[in-house]
Amino acid sequence: MQNSNWYKFFKNIKPEIISFSFLVSLLWFIRSPLKNTTELLEFEVEPKTIPFNQEFLNQVYEKAKHKYIWNYSPTQIIHKLEKLINTRIRI
């Protein structure tokens, strides 16, 4: 047994590496059930009345390039873009 390759291999491994590999395997095992709970962290902003195509987004970006609406969260940007479209203000 002591002359086997596996015994020599495990004998030469440092305890830190073994504990690190155990921790990684434990975290990997825990990650699997928690995989579906990350849906709570994801959110999607659904556009209400804005037609999102590339041409429209380019027009909006050109109009709002000099305004500071891009410093807001996605929902605030959506509301500001809706306000721009509804009031039809020329920027």
From Swiss-Prot:
Location(s), subcellular: Plastid, Cyanelle
Main location: plastid
Keywords: Cyanelle, Plastid
The organism's place on the tree of life at top rank: Eukaryota
Any GO CC annotation of this UniProt entry: cyanelle
Protein name (Swiss-Prot/TrEMBL): Uncharacterized 11.2 kDa protein in ycf23-apcF intergenic region
